[in-house]
Amino acid sequence: HVEDPQGDAAQKTDTSHHDQEHSTFNKITPSLAEFAFSLYRQLAHQSNSTNIFFSPVSIATAFAMLSLGTKADTHSEILEGLNFNLTEIPEAQIHEGFQELLHTLNKPDSQLQLTTGNGLFLNKSVKVVDKFLEDVKKLYHSEAFSVNFEDTEEAKKQINNYVEKGTQGKIVDLVKELDRDTVFALVNYIFFKGKWERPFEVEATKEEDFHVDQATTVKVPMMRRLGMFNIYHCEKLSSWVLLMKYLGNATAIFFLPDEGKLQHLENELTHDIITKFLENENRRSANLHLPKLAITGTYDLKTVLGHLGITKVFSNGADLSGVTEDAPLKLSKAVHKAVLTIDEKGTEAAGAMFLEAIPMSIPPEVKFNKPFVFLMIEQNTKSPLFMGKVVNPTQK
């Protein structure tokens, strides 16, 4: 039997092309994941009684984009704060990685209902470098707008209208206040409402207790389903781990810590562990109770990223000469808002289709009725779309 050398070679080149296509964002994914965990720990450290919810991908994208206009320390600080090691990855590859990532997330045929945007707002007196505007548009599909910050109310209205329009009215009044001396502001938003591959029955949802802490219990609508789930108890994390797929290449991973093990879980989570979970398909029967919730997070990134060492860009010593050559410029305000709805829905018609054979043994009852942590991962790129913690589902 003679190998067909042509065919073999053709196959080889084909796979290498395929790898190239996927390799750029693979290079940035571990950094994004570690950035997600550092940011999460930072927020958890500030308060253990509030919900946490943010989009690592979205924040990192906004600041990688901003780094295009920065120089010197301001520049390296941003990329290092996002967990990139510039001795290991050339900067061009970082931007290529984000470009691929955005391309994947914004595919028009995607069933993922994900809306994300970055708006840069500069005072009308600032003359912006053309190259910066081009890069922002070309690499990051974003826009820079000229506003009159001296008229604070009008500027605020313009920024909020941009976000409201971009999120189809889901996020209103994002910016509550602006300093009079603002010359440069960044807003970054992301909104997601996914559909489960396997929906829950609306009729099964019942009000149940959720134990916020030892002293506090609240009533929440609890979705319930007895079925086959990708769920298991992880000894290393002392937690139940549940993976649930959304239509359109996203997976939610929920972590329910054993009694008193929440902090242990928060400290132990790593990119490698998450990768292992995603590779492991481990279906078993369970009686699942998961709260229905709408969760939002709004963060002043100046404070949050400051704790991760990104401070220069917000200070008078900022070097944003790639944005404007006129006068010294600093970023006065950076706001991030993330919104997620978790409900029973799958595809509208799929309601009655799932008849599952449940094994005879008694399935464990897994109730997410106390604080839990969750991540949402985009399957193709393995990147963390969202990370959060639900301490109190009724918290507005």
Swiss-Prot record:
The modification Phosphoserine is found at S16, S361. GO terms for cellular component: extracellular space. GO terms for biological process: acute-phase response; regulation of proteolysis. It is found in: Secreted. InterPro entries: Serpin_CS, Serpin_dom, Serpin_fam, Serpin_sf, Serpin_sf_1, Serpin_sf_2. The keyword Secreted applies. Interacts with CELA2A. Interacts with ERGIC3 and LMAN1/ERGIC53. Interacts with PRSS1/Trypsin. This is Alpha-1-antitrypsin. It comes from Chlorocebus aethiops. The gene is SERPINA1.
